[in-house]
């Protein structure tokens, strides 16, 4: 019985620290120092939530830039089902999926001149990625310009405006947040 008391005391102490104090402290500090990020990085227009800056959306219309394909089951970009497809590079099913995506993108973008950018046909590890490279966005300009009656120059400037550089110049690559870019497109129509 004597040896049980220190073990029980340690258990209760660690339970209070790791199950109560630590989560409460991180929640309070997160809300205090980083309220936008701690609440999901929500993009709002007035009182309406239009999306999150961290999670992609399923834009399928010709007048929208499309992001990476989602690997989430049942519903695209479902944050509760986050995860990759887990198909190996050597898996023939992955080849079929990529070939089907390339064919669909070629059909939807007949005026695109170069090869389909790889990030438009491969899902990210989370299946929820909202960023593509500026080159992948530029590849889609002819389709979006035609659907929205906008000039190539207008869309090129919009992509440049919403391109984000990596925090460290030589680590990473510039990206465009598709959700923010498409919301900016909708504002052009207003």
Curated annotation (Swiss-Prot):
It comes from Escherichia coli (strain SE11). The chain crosses the membrane at residues 10-30. The keyword Nucleotide-binding applies. Belongs to the KdpC family. It is found in: Cell inner membrane. Its main location: membrane. One of its GO terms (molecular function) is ATP binding. Pfam families: KdpC. GO terms for cellular component: plasma membrane. The system is composed of three essential subunits: KdpA, KdpB and KdpC. It is a single-pass membrane protein. Part of the high-affinity ATP-driven potassium transport (or Kdp) system, which catalyzes the hydrolysis of ATP coupled with the electrogenic transport of potassium into the cytoplasm. This subunit acts as a catalytic chaperone that increases the ATP-binding affinity of the ATP-hydrolyzing subunit KdpB by the formation of a transient KdpB/KdpC/ATP ternary complex. This is Potassium-transporting ATPase KdpC subunit. Signal peptide: none annotated. It comes from the Bacteria. Keywords: ATP-binding, Cell inner membrane, Cell membrane, Ion transport, Membrane, Nucleotide-binding, Potassium, Potassium transport, Transmembrane, Transmembrane helix, Transport.
């Amino acid at each position: 019985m004597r040896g049980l008391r220190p073990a029980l005391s340690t258990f209760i102490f660690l339970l209070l620290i790791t199950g109560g104090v630590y989560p409460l402290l991180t929640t309070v500090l997160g809300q205090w120092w980083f309220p936008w990020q701690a609440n999901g990085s929500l993009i709002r227009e007035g009182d309406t939530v239009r999306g999150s800056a961290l999670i992609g959306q399923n834009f399928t219309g010709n007048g929208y830039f499309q992001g990476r394909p989602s690997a989430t089951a049942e519903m695209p970009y479902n944050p509760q089902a986050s995860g990759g497809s887990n198909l190996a590079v050597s898996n023939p099913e992955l080849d079929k999926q990529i070939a089907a995506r390339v064919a669909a993108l070629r059909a939807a973008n007949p005026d695109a001149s170069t090869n389909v950018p790889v990030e438009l046909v491969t899902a990210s590890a989370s299946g929820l990625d909202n960023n593509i490279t500026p080159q992948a966005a530029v590849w889609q300009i002819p389709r979006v310009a035609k659907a929205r009656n906008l000039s190539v120059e207008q869309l090129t400037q919009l992509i440049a405006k919403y391109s984000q550089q990596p925090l460290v110049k030589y680590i990473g690559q510039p990206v465009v947040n598709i959700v923010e870019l498409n919301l900016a497109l909708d504002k052009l129509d207003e």
